[in-house]
């Protein structure tokens, strides 16, 4: 894919993201698909051979910070990651440290660049994405405690933290106008309920904090000293009204956060910019030294990690399918699951976040659903089973993760991927261990497992694993039905994320939702999206859209089976919804 195109000599370092391209490349299609070769459109970039240049993107997920190096065609050259610590406390409290995360970012960037064989002078830009976690620091950048331990190093309220469930309910009771843009109900995972919790429980911390950041905005601030926030973060998680370019003062005053209004919202963001915008004067001398880069290296305004995955996947080339991002759903299947649809006009879907203007793709409205626990729910299901320890031993002996070993075992029992659902037998799972994010917007919902027997063997664990995956797929199917009912039509699901790396999972999602599932050829679409932010900030491409056009690749497509398999999944989906209803009635 590199040879013969002038932009092949450009290199990008990134951590998660991408979008649409008009030309088509070779696409390998599995099962009932064909392989079609189509010519790659010639680049409009200069034909001379420029010096080697690279951009870096960084992604901070729930458990690690990662960095990757890409060339201008989107090919991954090198990547690295470093683990981060998460603290769990009673009361659904989950916290992290911004200092530790920054250290992990620096290690990952240094390692990725070293593996790429590039020098600091070759790096012209860096982009960031991260989980939508809340960071509290003083005006000078010192961490501020956000939890009952009083430890200032624990200064991040992690995205999955549900301490503010009561505060979210109080806000929702007010029927505020801004709630129309979060599906009618604000989630305890969003930032204003968490800030209200701080006011009630740690008032001094609310006073001491000179800045409250979404994590990805914190990373760009620490890199550049610029306090500009991304449209993505403040619109999706802080109730900023991007379509009106304003905060709603009446909302903040009404819910008790008038202190943030008093200084003109300076502590949560006065300057709001589009993702990929070049910030400040680039890397400060201190940040550059820590990252192993040069001062002044361009830094792009950030994205939330899931949205980076959306940008990094929606533009893939699919044979015989137009690159229409309004007909594609980006589904990022990781610890949680995020499902993002774009539209040319605002579409209000009850229980689904948004519509958010320009929060992911410029000029388009974003509607965002998903589940708080997806990959985490699968991990929890496995850990609950009596055979989990034995499966772990087998997996270790085979040099595999437990999940990969279970997939291998399932494939041995069911060589045809579409028949793997039979292994679930009578077991049904509603995997809502951390509530229902959408379309019911019910943080109090809990998981349901039905159809268990006294079997404690390995193959029973395999069946539970498959049933759990089906449950994740049926939750997505339910969301798609809600979107469809309000006028958002989806033809293809574009999947990414650590929990969606296997063909078995992708085929099962296609069968469970009855919609084709496509997977980008790049192994790291979220990292790729962040690399695109860097490319835009550095001026390597004239816009983020053009970076997406040139860096998106091909897709592998998994088509849903018909007849018996389709009927079985329809019946199981009906059981899924029935169990959901009963669970609400009896709690």
Regions found by a protein language model. Give the residues of each.
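Short hydrophobic alpha-helical segments enriched in small aliphatic residues
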Residues: 3, 8-13, 24
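Phosphate/pyrophosphate-binding loops at sites that engage ATP/ADP/AMP, CoA/4′-phosphopantetheine
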Residues: 107-124, 202-206, 251-265, 479-491
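Gly/Ser/Thr-rich active-site cleft segment
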Residues: 60-62, 128, 140, 178-306, ...
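Glycine/Thr-rich phosphate-binding loops that ligate phosphate moieties of nucleotide
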Residues: 32-81, 88, 124, 128-169, ...
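Conserved phosphate-binding catalytic cores of ATP/NTP-utilizing and phosphoryl-transfer enzymes
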Residues: 39-51, 284-293, 303-326
């Amino acid at each position: 894919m590199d040879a013969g195109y002038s932009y092949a000599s450009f290199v990008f370092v990134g951590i998660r993201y991408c979008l649409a391209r008009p030309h088509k490349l070779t696409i390998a299609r599995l099962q009932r698909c064909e392989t079609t070769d189509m010519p790659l459109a010639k680049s409009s970039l200069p034909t001379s051979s420029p010096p080697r240049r690279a951009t870096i993107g960084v992604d901070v997920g729930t458990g690690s910070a990662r960095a990757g190096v890409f060339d201008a065609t989107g090919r991954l050259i090198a990547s690295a990651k470093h683990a981060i610590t998460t603290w769990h406390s009673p009361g659904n409290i989950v916290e992290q440290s911004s200092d530790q995360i920054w250290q992990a970012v620096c290690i990952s960037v240094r390692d990725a660049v070293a593996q790429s064989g590039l020098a600091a002078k070759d790096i012209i830009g860096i982009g960031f994405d991260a989980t939508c976690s809340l960071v509290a620091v003083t005006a000078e950048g010192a961490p501020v405690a956000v939890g009952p331990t009083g430890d200032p190093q624990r200064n991040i309220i992690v995205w999955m933290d549900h301490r503010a469930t009561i505060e979210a309910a109080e806000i929702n009771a007010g029927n505020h106008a801004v709630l129309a843009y979060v599906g009618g109900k604000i989630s305890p995972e969003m930032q204003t309920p968490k800030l209200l919790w701080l006011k009630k429980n740690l008032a001094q911390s609310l006073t001491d904090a000179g800045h409250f950041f979404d994590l990805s905005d914190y990373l760009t601030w620490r890199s550049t000293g610029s306090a500009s926030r991304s449209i993505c973060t403040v619109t999706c998680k802080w109730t900023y009204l991007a379509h009106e370019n304003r905060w709603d003062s009446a909302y903040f005053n009404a819910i008790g956060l008038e202190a943030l209004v008093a200084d003109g919202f300076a502590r949560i963001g006065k300057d709001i910019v589009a993702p990929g915008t070049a910030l400040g004067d680039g890397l400060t001398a201190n940040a550059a030294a820590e990252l192993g880069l040069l001062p002044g290296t361009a830094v792009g305004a950030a994205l939330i990690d899931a949205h980076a995955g959306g940008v990094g996947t929606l533009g893939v080339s699919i044979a015989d399918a137009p690159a229409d991002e309004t007909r594609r759903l980006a589904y990022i299947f990781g610890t949680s699951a995020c499902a993002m649809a774009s539209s040319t006009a605002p579409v209000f879907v009850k229980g689904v976040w948004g519509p958010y203007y320009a929060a992911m793709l410029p000029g388009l409205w974003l509607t965002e659903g998903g589940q708080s626990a997806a990959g985490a729910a699968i991990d929890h299901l496995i850990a609950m089973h009596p055979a989990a320890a034995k499966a772990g031993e087998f997996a270790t002996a085979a040099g595999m993760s437990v999940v990969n070993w279970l997939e291998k075992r399932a494939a041995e029992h069911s060589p045809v991927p579409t028949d793997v659902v039979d292994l679930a037998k009578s077991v049904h799972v509603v995997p809502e261990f951390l509530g229902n994010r959408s379309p019911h917007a019910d943080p109090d919902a809990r998981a349901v497992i039905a159809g268990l027997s006294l079997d404690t063997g390995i193959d029973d664990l395999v069946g539970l694993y498959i049933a759990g995956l089906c449950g994740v797929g049926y939750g997505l199917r339910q969301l798609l039905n809600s979107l469809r009912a309000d006028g958002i039509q989806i033809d293809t699901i574009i999947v990414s994320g650590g929990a969606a790396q296997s063909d078995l999972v992708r085929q099962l999602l296609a069968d469970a939702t009855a919609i084709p599932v496509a997977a980008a050829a790049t192994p790291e679409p979220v990292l790729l999206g962040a690399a695109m932010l860097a490319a835009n900030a550095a001026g390597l491409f004239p816009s983020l859209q053009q970076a997406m056009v040139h860096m998106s690749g091909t897709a592998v497509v998994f088509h849903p089976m018909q007849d018996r398999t389709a009927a079985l999944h329809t019946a199981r989906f009906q059981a899924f919804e029935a169990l959901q209803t009963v669970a609400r009635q009896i709690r």
